Amino acid sequence: MAQNFGKIPSHKSYVLSLYRTVLRNIPKCCHSYAFQYEIKKTLSKQLFKHKHDKSSWSVYTLLNEFSLLNNCLLEGKLQEIKNLMKPLKKMKKQLETTKILNSLTSLGDVKTNDPEEVRRFHVLSAYIKRKQDLGLLPAYIPKTYQHKLLLPLALNEHACLKLFHIQQKLKNGPPSAGLSYTKEGRNQIWFVRSPINKGRQQSKKLGILIRKERKDSQKNIDNLNFCEINAAWALHEAIWEEYLESKKIIKVNLPKYLEYAANIPKSTKCNPSSQYQKVKEWVDPVREIMFELHSKSFQRVEYFNKYKEKLLKNGGQLAYFDKKSKEMYAKRLTLFRKMSKETLPYVTLFIEGRDLPSVLAKYGF
């Protein structure tokens, strides 16, 4: 029985030795990085492709070409190397072209499904599975029965559930707009939440603002953490210099010294409170930067608190969206009553256009 050449130790040793030699000679004898990459890529592909080759003649031919490639590299015959690689390139191009043609041919056979058809199929599948679990339908149902008999029943059941939810929402009364917030760092970004502006209807500017504040808050936190690390090193330097001058080791409560109070005057915040000159020289510059960062953060908090007051003012966004929500509710209630009186009593399952899904779509539900 033919044995794989990869399992013969002498063959494996020879191929690996030659491969290492060629890899070492490529950068030595070829000065084009692009051509070096091309040779290595082609060589790697061919070795992987013929790894399990059992044909002695094929292996013999490939080893001769491998050895010839190494000799051409040593002699600087780059054109001959290109000639050796040409048949491999042609084969690759033909294979790629065949793949593209096959994919284009298969594209013509694929039927693109309408999203509405996909939705109807899911409704039908869920309906059949539910009824089969209850033992109300057999395991096998012909396609004709599924589409002509069960599909209208499934869509009607789905529409009935939808109608019930609409009725419950209208029964609960008009929805009201309210204030909500998202927290980014110290900031509470307030915005109006209502049925009018939920989901995709939400303001794009609000999304941009929230992302910007999130990024700025994180940057501020990172800067403060960096300053705290530098302040610790600065305090060590101050203690060392003070010791060199006075032979005394000073003690400073660094967290308390760097503590920022938001409700005292700025002049008090930034004045150095240490009695040691070296601490003032080393730690105070970092401390002042930290105070500026804290001050900037609290300014943003004040800005968003004032923004909340604007939203709550008479005639502001909250009142506007609350009014629009009530108008939308009144309009939907009128349409629902009209639909209940004029159309719902005459719904027919198996007549397209007069079934319940079509009626709900007609009235915007």
From Swiss-Prot:
Q: Does the keyword Mitochondrion apply?
A: yes
Query: Any one cellular component term from GO for this entry?
Result: mitochondrion
Primary location? mitochondrion
The answer to whether the entry has keyword Glycoprotein is: yes
Q: How does the record describe the protein's post-translational processing?
A: N-glycosylated. Glycosylation is important for correct localization of the protein.
| Alphabetic keyword roster | Glycoprotein, Mitochondrion
**Compartment(s):** Mitochondrion
**Family membership:** Belongs to the RRG1 family.
Entry function:
Essential for respiratory growth and required for mitochondrial protein synthesis. Required for vacuolar acidification.
What is the protein name given in its UniProt record? Required for respiratory growth protein 1, mitochondrial
| Source organism (scientific name) | Saccharomyces cerevisiae (strain Lalvin EC1118 / Prise de mousse) (Baker's yeast)
UniProt gene name: RRG1
